[in-house]
């Protein structure tokens, strides 16, 4: 699967470079080339996600990105890392995506957990103002 995925990546990269009229080079020529590289990387990322996720799961991830971009990016990174290491053998369905989201949200809530401590005054039996 890695060889097939790599071939798809190379073909898509060649196609995008042909569209932009640029040859592959390691020399950056200003912010426009950085922007083009970012666009190419985003395109490759979206292609990989479309290969990993079923359509309903992809739609759910897009809706989540509208509300919580950080969570959506964390899930995308996790999915891409799992795909690169060969942990994904089939397309991820929507219920499986929900499980991943719950896992990530549980980790985030543990990190961001705040405790409120209320120190109540101890009732003092001895008054200084005995009149």
Swiss-Prot record:
Annotated GO biological process: chaperone-mediated protein folding
Which superkingdom heads the taxonomic lineage of this protein's source?
Answer: Eukaryota
Stretches assigned to coiled coil:
none
The protein's matches in InterPro entries, at most eight in alphabetical order, are given as: PDCD5-like, PDCD5-like_sf
Gene3D superfamilies according to UniProt: PDCD5-like
Q: Where is the composition biased (Polar residues)?
A: 23-34
Protein name (record): Uncharacterized protein C23C4.09c
From which organism does this entry originate? Schizosaccharomyces pombe (strain 972 / ATCC 24843)
């Amino acid at each position: 699967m890695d060889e097939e995925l790599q071939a798809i990546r190379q073909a898509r990269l060649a196609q995008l470079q042909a569209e932009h009229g640029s040859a592959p080079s390691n020399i950056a020529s200003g912010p426009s080339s950085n922007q083009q590289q970012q666009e190419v990387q985003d395109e490759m990322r979206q292609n990989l996600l479309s290969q990993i996720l079923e359509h309903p799961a992809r739609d759910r991830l897009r809706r989540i990105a509208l509300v919580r971009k950080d969570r959506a990016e964390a899930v995308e990174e996790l999915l891409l890392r799992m795909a690169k290491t060969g942990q994904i053998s089939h397309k991820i369905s929507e219920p499986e995506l929900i499980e991943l989201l719950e896992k990530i949200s549980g980790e985030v809530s543990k990190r961001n957990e705040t405790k409120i401590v209320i120190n109540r005054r101890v009732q003092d039996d001895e008054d200084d103002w005995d009149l």
